[in-house]
Amino acid sequence: EQERLVFHVLTKSLNLPAISMWFLINPPGKATVHILSIDNFEWSSKYNIYQENNSSDPRYTSELNYLRFYLPDIFPALNKIVLLDHDVVVQQDLSELWNINMKGNVIGAVGTCQEGKIPFHRIDMFVNLSDPLIGKRFDANACTWAFGMNLFDLQRWRRHNLTAVYQNYLQM
């Protein structure tokens, strides 16, 4: 049912003309494409979308990396969304992702740890757990997940006000 597919492409205004032209030249069949510039979002001015951190690494300074935490605000009419990062290469039909039973979870994601192996991507590699307030809230050995492909239950996210929870963690 390709006509029911809607791709929301989010980008910086600098890239908007090139991406728009690419989709004009390469239309996605019967699917719809909405291309949006994050520079036009009202919500970005009311949130501190990334911490000041003296880093020039775009993984930590680009607003695009923080968008997933604001999806319920960006798409208030949507209840569920499959998020694919810019570097994901799709090799098969992803429609079954839509039918995954999330068992009450807000996020469905690909884990980065394999059973029986030493975890390579643990939470303590990404979060400073030396602060006791933060350290007691997280399991240092917990595995992280791959950010490249996620399924979000936006209704549940809104119900639990998780954007506010995320904002609180940023302030710590």
Pin down the residues of each PLM region:
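Glycosyltransferase catalytic domains, chiefly GT-A lineage
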Residues: 1-172
